């Protein structure tokens, strides 16, 4: 082999080593932001960042690393985020930030501000899964200083509930918002969700929340199961099908489902029918057409649109349960 060939081979080797070192540094020397927590008291903003400093590839959403929390404050949302970034051990990388947690006392203002900011700054995604939370960033920081596992448990909680959570860009039409709570070293979602619309925010009962998820084709569980605490006893449903029909001047909501109970509780179908109609009316009052009655009306009558600004139409529910 000639001297020139040896030089070319050595140059290629040096280049490969340099590229490997560069890629390793680029992938690991970052603080990967996994979730953004935002709250405001009207005069200032407080931000919390759940981040990890991975030892594996930064492109892997399952990178093995402990989850940590840092916070920042500022008169504006952008300045609060910048302050939180300065508290990170390494420069921030937002590629894996898929979750936004808003304080339940300032949900509407927080979500509107985040949507506007994300349109111009790469701090998050308009497709971020959105959650409410009953605790402040300060309380989370205090508890996280006492136990290292809390931030990681919080992230795991919202990851588990993510399929049932709405996305940020859906706020203009309203949505059902799950609320996360802290309990010792763990976190869990509250059985009672919020209805968030541009007009107002209201709370559903536990049964209404479960029915609202059922009508939307969502579930808290990985198996798609729905659980109801009826007066006659607990009921577990799966493989639900929901449909809307026009019945004269009123709407008919059909719900068919498989029951996982060995024996159906007495009057289970009647209880679910009443709950279904009650949930639709409650959401309608808060400004959310959860069953798409307006869209069904528009398809039927063309130009005429039924919106939540109108009085809620008459509703009848028909529930049919079958054993697995």
Which role does the model predict for each range below?
Residues 1-324:
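Membrane-proximal alpha-helical signals and transmembrane carboxylates
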């Amino acid at each position: 082999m000639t001297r020139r060939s040896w030089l070319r081979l050595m140059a290629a080797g040096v280049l490969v080593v340099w590229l490997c070192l560069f890629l390793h540094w680029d992938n690991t020397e970052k603080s990967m932001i996994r979730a953004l927590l935002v709250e405001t008291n009207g005069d200032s903003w407080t931000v919390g960042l759940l981040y990890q400093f991975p030892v594996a590839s930064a492109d892997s959403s399952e990178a093995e690393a402990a989850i940590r929390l840092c916070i920042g404050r500022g008169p504006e949302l952008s300045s609060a985020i910048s302050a939180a970034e300065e508290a990170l051990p390494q420069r921030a990388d937002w590629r894996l930030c898929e979750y936004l947690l808003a304080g339940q006392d300032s949900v509407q203002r927080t979500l509107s501000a985040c949507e506007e900011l994300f349109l111009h700054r790469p701090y998050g995604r308009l497709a971020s899964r959105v959650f409410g939370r009953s605790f402040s960033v300060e309380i989370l920081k205090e508890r996280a200083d006492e136990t290292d596992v809390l931030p990681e448990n919080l992230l795991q909680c919202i990851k588990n509930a993510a399929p049932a959570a709405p996305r940020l860009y859906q706020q203009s039409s309203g949505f059902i918002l799950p609320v996360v709570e802290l309990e010792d070293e763990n976190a869990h979602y509250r059985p009672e969700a919020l209805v968030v619309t541009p007009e107002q925010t209201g709370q559903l009962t536990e049964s209404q929340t479960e029915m609202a998820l059922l009508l939307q084709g969502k579930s808290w569980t990985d198996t798609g199961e729905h659980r109801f605490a009826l007066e006659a006893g607990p009921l577990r449903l799966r493989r639900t099908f929901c449909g809307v029909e026009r019945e004269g001047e009123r709407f008919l909501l059909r719900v068919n489902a498989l029951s996982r109970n060995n024996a159906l509780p007495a009057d289970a179908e009647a209880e679910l029918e009443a709950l279904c109609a009650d949930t639709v009316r409650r959401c309608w009052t808060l400004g959310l057409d959860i069953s798409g009655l307006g869209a069904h009306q528009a398809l039927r009558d063309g130009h005429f649109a039924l919106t939540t600004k109108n009085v809620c139409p008459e509703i009848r529910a028909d529930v049919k349960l079958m054993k697995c």
